[in-house]
Amino acid sequence: PNSKRYDGTPGTGGMGYSLSGRSASALPKPTYNSNKQGKVVVRIWVDREGNVVKAEPGYKGTTATDEGLRRKAKEAAMQAKFTPSKDAPELQVGTITYDFRTFN
């Protein structure tokens, strides 16, 4: 089943992921110093060792149009690490969602 885990607190950027049968062993938060807001869904491709080998921001559900937020989300997604699975497909596709929020 699809696993969704959430981390973060409002104002610092919430995160969640979906990658069937895998747990996140590292899910870095993006660093950003901006008042821009929105959600960026990054489509990820993960190898059997748990490494993210490809990431494309702007997947279905993305609300942020700012390219800076999308770039930061992609950078963080490429650093994510998931549990290895020898039974997984050679490349398993999932998503990581980053919610960039600020409060004035």
Enumerate the predicted regions with their spans:
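A short, well-structured alpha-helical segment
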Residues: 18-19, 33-41, 45-92
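Short, low-complexity, Pro/Ser/Thr/Gly-rich segments in the mature regions of secreted, periplasmic
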Residues: 97-103
